[in-house]
């Protein structure tokens, strides 16, 4: 095990006073410069695992460590080191695609110059510039997914968690989305993708769990 790997060690999580088991004694290791896919049926605890990594859900037992830091015990640090694209995107009424991306970068403390440069670049790379100034709640489901993806990757953290990133996305931009993930992996980022699309897993990921 290397310190730069994300180490998930024997984590378990239950809800409803133990009646619902979200995940049970999960152990795995994620690596920089790699795209890892997590596949499984609905209700298998995939989304719960992502939320545990970023610190939104605390496991009942076990630990998650990165660079010697427990992300379970340091949820604030986890949110600084990890970016997440959630399974569902709820755009705010009247907020444009461009504004959605810019706002998350400002929250991260990115300089105003970088906010505009990074936003412009991700819009271009995903070929969604023509919708940049449309309100998010007026966009199609696929474009809302792309908005959420762009928000997670425009100024990427060390670890990037993506929950069903290509759902409802058209074939051309599905490919662009995976190409963007590969670019980030080549830059050293750790990409962890939840998906049901086995064809995409076989074509684009380095390994799957």
Residues covered by each model-derived region:
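Conserved ABC ATPase "signature" region
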Residues: 102, 106, 113-131
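The feature captures the beta-strand-to-loop junction immediately N-terminal to the Walker
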Residues: 39-41
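Catalytic Walker B motif of ABC-type/P-loop ATPase nucleotide-binding domains
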Residues: 160-163
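Conserved ABC ATPase signature
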Residues: 135-139
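Conserved ABC transporter NBD signature motif
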Residues: 62-73, 77-78
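Helix-to-loop junction immediately C-terminal to a conserved catalytic motif
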Residues: 54
């Amino acid at each position: 095990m290397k310190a730069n790997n994300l180490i998930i060690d024997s984590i378990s999580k239950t809800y409803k006073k133990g009646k619902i088991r979200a995940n049970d004694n999960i152990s795995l290791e994620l690596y920089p410069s790699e795209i890892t896919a997590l596949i499984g049926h609905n209700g298998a605890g995939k989304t719960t695992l992502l939320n545990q990594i970023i610190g939104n859900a605390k496991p009942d037992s076990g630990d998650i460590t990165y660079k010697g830091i427990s992300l379970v015990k340091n949820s604030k640090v986890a949110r600084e080191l990890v970016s997440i694209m959630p399974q569902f995107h709820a755009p705010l009424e009247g907020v444009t695609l461009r504004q959605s991306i810019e706002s998350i970068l400002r929250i991260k403390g990115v300089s105003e110059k970088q906010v505009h440069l990074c936003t412009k670049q991700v819009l271009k790379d995903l070929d969604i510039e023509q919708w940049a100034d449309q309100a998010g709640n007026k966009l199609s489901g696929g474009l809302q997914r792309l908005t959420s993806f762009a928000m997670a990757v425009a100024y990427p953290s060390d670890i990037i968690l993506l929950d069903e990133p290509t759902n409802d996305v058209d074939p051309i931009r599905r490919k662009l989305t995976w190409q963007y993930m590969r670019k980030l992996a080549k830059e050293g980022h750790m990409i962890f993708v939840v998906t049901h699309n086995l064809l995409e897993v076989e074509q684009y990921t380095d390994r799957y769990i």
